[in-house]
Amino acid sequence: MGLCYTCRMASVLLCLSTSKYNSRVIEKGAQIAKNNHATLSAVYVQTPKDESMSAASKSCLRENIKFAESKGAKVTILYGHNKIRQIVEYVDVSQVDCVVIEKSLASQALFRLRDIDVYSVNYPHDYRRLFYFDFSSFR
């Protein structure tokens, strides 16, 4: 199953992480936004655990933020104890139409988000997948 490029949406949200594979989330989200003439934003949720983050993870996060900004995303840093709860609340407040997120977070989000379209895309040379959430059906 591939991404739905025919869906019309006004805004796309990228979920940033410290993963070296997060660039794939950014690329796909930017492509979806471009195809739909949608605004692009990105969010990273900082938790208390992030204080003990390794230097390599911090570096990867900085690179992912810079990459998202280079694709035209407005980056927002949120603070909280639960990444998924913060993302879901941000989506509700911001009226985001589409969220592009890594599988590790998406599997947790599915328990909180109902009646959404989920599309997956394989990472190149990797078993992981991306998930695409279309929130336009909520309005």
Language-model region placement:
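General small-molecule cofactor/ligand-binding pocket signal
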Residues: 41-43, 74-79, 119-121
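Small/aliphatic-rich secondary-structure junction motif
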Residues: 3-56, 69
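A short acidic, amphipathic alpha-helical/loop segment
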Residues: 27-29, 87-90, 108-112
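Structural beta-alpha unit
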Residues: 1-5, 71-99, 105-106, 127, ...
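Short beta-alpha junction loops
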Residues: 45-50, 81, 124-125
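Long, charge-dense
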Residues: 51-76, 86
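Residue-level detector of structured alpha->beta connecting loops
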Residues: 37, 72, 95, 115-117
